[in-house]
Amino acid sequence: MKVGTTEEDIGTEASRNLRKGFATLFAVYRNLANDSYYGDAANVIEYSISNCSWAAPQPTDDGYEIAYSVDVDGNPIYTADMTDEERFDAALQASIGFFKAAGYTWDEATQTFTAAPEGAKMSYEVICPANGGEDHPAYLLCEYVRQALEKIGITLVINNPSDSNVIWNALEANTEEMWCAAWSATLDPDMYQTWHSKNVVGAPGSTGSNHAYLIDEQLDQLIMDARTSSDQEYRKAIYKECLDIIKDWGVEVPYYQRQEMYVVSAERVNVDTITPDVTPYWNWMNDIQNMEMN
């Protein structure tokens, strides 16, 4: 998604503002959609990294912020005492600001956008493979955003295929505009495969994992710098810079992280011998030699 007609236009300020206009609305409805679908079985995350990783920014860290929570001028969109409805309205107003900055034509009389700048559109598609129904964590999120955008004259078409191959074929052909999918992460938070420009889909020798087509020299250098050290504090600081760059491009809205669940019989297993404080990277199977049966 970009404003302009060349491939290089994907990185312009106007193109970033276009994407942030959508991202701001997707971000504000995440808690509502997640609570409806997962409840306590998943938590909303604010950065494009596993929240269980040692490199994940934490609320107590300097510079930590809620995803897409500032307006086009860099001011906070929300206050702590806002109700949900006030937050939704504030996000919509911030979204309007981003679209205006992207070059969209705003009609004060109707309070809607009436025309898109060259290279952008009044209607965009998001692929959310919910098997033709609503059984997908992001389906309700997309619907909330669709309804919000409709108020300001922009159309979001939810492509809800029954065949999930539709999304993968679109990604392979580079025909997608927005899409919803889950991803898994390895123990080491190295970002080379997903975010380095050498792995943009179609590039020679590419892993094909950079579906955002994000080409940023500073990001590339930071990713490589982080690979030169085993110092976790150093790498965490570098990855925070990377995550902020990714957010500034407006190419991904982090949504949720599922909770791991295990069911055991206390009649059969001595639960005191089960691994305490399991994580996605270290669970009961890693300490199975310590487990005892009753």
Language model features by range: what are they?
Residues V126, Q147-G202:
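Periplasmic binding protein-like
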Residues M1-T12, C52-A90, E108-K121, N169-N174, ...:
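Short, solvent-exposed loop/beta-turn-alpha elements that line the ligand-binding surface or hinge
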Residues R30-L32, D40-A41, G132-P137, N165-W168, ...:
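Flexible loop/turn segments at secondary-structure boundaries
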Residues L25-G39, A102-G103, I152-L156, W183, ...:
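A generic secondary-structure signal for well-formed alpha-helical elements
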Residues L25, D35, S50, P129, ...:
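Active-site-proximal beta-strand/loop segments in catalytic clefts of secreted hydrolases
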Residues I223-R227, Q232-K247:
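Short amphipathic alpha-helical coiled-coil/interface segments
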Residues G11-Q147, E241, Q289-E292:
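Append "and occasionally in soluble cytosolic enzymes with long acidic Gly/Pro-rich linkers
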